[in-house]
Regions:
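C-terminal binding/interaction regions
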Residues: 2-47, 95-164
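Alpha-helix C-terminal capping segments
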Residues: 59, 89-95
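Short, well-ordered amphipathic alpha-helical segments that serve as non-catalytic structural scaffolds
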Residues: 37, 82-90
Length: 164
């Protein structure tokens, strides 16, 4: 019963857009800024085939933001998601410590629903973050968003610690 109550309280906190206590770096105002940056990144998406545009904004521990958008290709396999674009961009600049990522997306760039990361992006995130502390923010707007720990989106995950 206690576990079920905790799960319900966690869902209520998330639905209200309140942060879970494990990540002190990310306030509500920071979340809104990340969502705004993700929306701007989404506008740059190249999605001529699916018309589903996605943007992301990745926050480092040093409070620097790297944005990404999805880039499609006619062969589909070489396409890249917004989340991976942001991570690869940050890593190519020497960043290694990340706090959160905000993700938005929708058909023709219209935000109608939450846009969770695909399985490949979840696994890429897992490579570079502590899934118990890293926040994944999925948003419809700056006021309407859900916050998860990566661990909740990718339970029982395989990561670098398994092969070290």
């Amino acid at each position: 019963m206690k576990q079920e109550e905790d799960r319900i309280h966690s869902l209520v906190r998330r639905e209200k857009g309140e942060l879970l206590a494990k990540n002190e770096l990310v306030s509500r105002s920071v979340i809104r800024l990340l969502i705004r940056d993700a929306i701007e990144a989404m506008e740059k998406a190249y999605a001529p085939y699916s018309h589903f545009k996605v943007g992301s904004a990745l926050l480092t521990i040093k409070q620097k933001v790297y944005t990404g958008c999805n880039v499609e290709n006619a062969a589909y396999s070489p396409s890249n998601c917004a989340e991976r674009t942001a991570f690869f961009k940050a890593i190519s600049e020497g960043e290694k410590d990340f706090a959160a990522i905000a993700i938005v997306g929708g058909k023709d760039g219209i935000l109608q629903d939450y846009c969770p990361p695909c399985g490949v992006c979840r696994q890429v995130m897992r490579e570079f973050v502590d899934p118990r502390k890293f926040l994944v923010i999925v948003a419809k707007s700056e006021e309407d968003y859900l916050v998860y720990f990566l661990e909740e989106l990718l339970p029982i995950s395989f990561g670098p610690d398994y092969i070290e």
